[in-house]
Amino acid sequence: MAGPLQGGGARALDLLRGLPRVSLANLKPNPGSKKPERRPRGRRRGRKCGRGHKGERQRGTRPRLGFEGGQTPFYIRIPKYGFNEGHSFRRQYKPLSLNRLQYLIDLGRVDPSQPIDLTQLVNGRGVTIQPLKRDYGVQLVEEGADTFTAKVNIEVQLASELAIAAIEKNGGVVTTAFYDPRSLDIVCKPVPFFLRGQPIPKRMLPPEELVPYYTDAKNRGYLADPAKFPEARLELARKYGYILPDITKDELFKMLCTRKDPRQIFFGLAPGWVVNMADKKILKPTDENLLKYYTS
């Protein structure tokens, strides 16, 4: 048999023998612990349930909100005006300042040597377009007009007069064009659309109330008469006091003159074409009826 424990083991056993035994008499919560109070019956909301003694407040027969005892209430007495009438159907345009556009160009997120449209702006994280929230594109504003130095061919949906002047002063070109919600979703997210294997649809024409804006050369509308653009550019240059550059002698003249057809969504891709992402090919329709439909 083993002999009696000696050293540290013996001292540990002696210490345990002297400790009190665990029993109901010496149990207590841990230091810092909190036990939720138990709510007995009839506590806080007992007897009258907090409604008081009799009357309409206890019986729940109080008049509705806005009732004034029988007289004409305030919300009917005062006439209303439709300031917000049709607010859920109004078109919204995300602002894009010239300062922001110059910033995107300086970082290389937008290529000024190519025509700039919504596809470039969205892919460069310059703007966020949400067609489901009534976004209809981008509005070019004049903030940063004094510091804008890039020469660009940009297509937006709305543009202020000073923003147009700032771009044309540097030899650039501005075009305002309308996109219906379906075309807007496709031009902002081209890759998911191409992966579906569907033909590129025709872009719809603007509604009746927007036709005057997009047919005016002063707004650089895409439906305006091209013969009126030189006169409108010269008139704007005289108004703001700058010399209009001759873009016909510019080495980027071909890029600056590139414009989309009113029915076209992408640069270089016509309606009716199918982009095959797997084989990296473009399929074009050959049927006469399809060609007639997509060119009409």
Swiss-Prot record:
Query: Record's superkingdom?
Result: Eukaryota
Main location per the UniProt record: mitochondrion
Instruction: Give residue spans, biased composition: Basic residues.
Output: 36-52
Q: Where is the transit peptide?
A: 1-21
- GO MF annotation: an example: RNA binding
Please verify whether the record's keywords include Secreted: no
What are the entry keywords?
Mitochondrion, Ribonucleoprotein, Ribosomal protein, Transit peptide
Q: One GO term of the cellular component aspect?
A: mitochondrial inner membrane
Disulphide-bonded residues: none
BP term (GO), one: mitochondrial translation
One matching Pfam family is Ribosomal_L27A
Range of residues in the leader sequence: none
Please give the residue ranges the record annotates as the region Disordered. Answer: 22-66
Q: Where in the cell is it found?
A: Mitochondrion
According to its UniProt record, which protein family does this protein belong to? Belongs to the universal ribosomal protein uL15 family.
SUBUNIT field: Component of the mitochondrial large ribosomal subunit (mt-LSU). Mature mammalian 55S mitochondrial ribosomes consist of a small (28S) and a large (39S) subunit. The 28S small subunit contains a 12S ribosomal RNA (12S mt-rRNA) and 30 different proteins. The 39S large subunit contains a 16S rRNA (16S mt-rRNA), a copy of mitochondrial valine transfer RNA (mt-tRNA(Val)), which plays an integral structural role, and 52 different proteins.
Protein name per its UniProtKB record: Large ribosomal subunit protein uL15m
Please state the gene responsible for encoding this protein.
MRPL15
